[in-house]
Amino acid sequence: MTKEHSRYRWFVVTVFFFFMLLHQTDKLMIGSLQVQISNDFQISNTQWGLVNSGALIVATVLYPIWGYLYDRYSRTKLLSLASLIWGATTWFNAIVKSFGGFLVTRASTGVDDSSYPGLYTLIADYFGPTQRGRVYGILQLAQPLGYLIGMILALMVAPAIGGWRSVFYITGSLGLVIAVLIFFFVKEMPRGKAEPEFENMAEMQTFKFSWAEAKEIFKKKTMWFVFLQGFAGVFPWNVITYFFFAYLEKERGYDANGILFTMAPVILILASGYFVGGSLGDFAFKRTNKGRI
């Protein structure tokens, strides 16, 4: 590997890190804005639950569709499109004046929420299996850090610059900037390029999506444990993300500073776990193929 290629692939990681960081900021800060938005539209907790459920349902439906598209078309162009959609839907979400419009436009933000599979597969073609855990750990840092930045924007910045709509304009605009950055500066890589098995091949075969192979995933018992573990892990976090801030403010009487200093240490500890876990996974994998398990 040339020094130039080595530097470039870390440039790609940097671009994708900021894509995830700013996207997670945009996605997760709505929980910190619950009281502001609920007061603006005069909605109940049940209606607030519908706001967040809409985006989750849309994202769930579109995960396999994004995956299918990533297997057939350029991942860089699709990721640029996802970033463009993120920026546009967030702007629409800020513009609408009625709760019905807000509900629909918020659900539309789920379109780009399910776009991450292509990012991870593209990174896998830049880095070999012995480095991926560390790189994925770095990228996953973006989620809790984005959560923290979203809290700061919602609790500290929004009241100072005109309310929640103003911060949506900021994060939506950043999505458009990232879309341009990915489109023009991130290069597609041949699929499987970083796999050791393909290292000495003069010409690589082009692989296409296969429904038959996709169905084989569900026959692997290990994958069912992964699905169940993911469900059990995500379930409580959705409650914390979308309802906990209003609970602290309304039920416990916390002010913005109190909420921030209560949640920030938890988020920072969570963030450290991503990088440490990824690095330990790489360390164990170098010694046995079952190291990450």
For each predicted feature, which ranges?
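Extracytoplasmic
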Residues: 11-45, 66, 240-245
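Residue-level signature of mid-helix packing/kink "hotspots" within the transmembrane helices
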Residues: 28, 56-64, 114, 147-148, ...
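Extracytoplasmic gate region of multi-pass secondary transporters
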Residues: 30-31, 220-275
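Helix-breaking motifs and short loop linkers at transmembrane-helix boundaries and internal kinks
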Residues: 42, 74, 95-101, 128, ...
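Conserved MFS/SLC helix-loop-helix module at the cytosolic interface between two early adjacent transmembrane helices
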Residues: 61-99
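Cytoplasmic helix-loop-helix junction between adjacent transmembrane helices
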Residues: 105-144
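Helix-loop-helix hairpin linking two adjacent transmembrane segments in secondary transporters
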Residues: 139-188
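Flexible cytoplasmic inter-helical loops of multi-pass small-molecule transporters
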Residues: 187-212
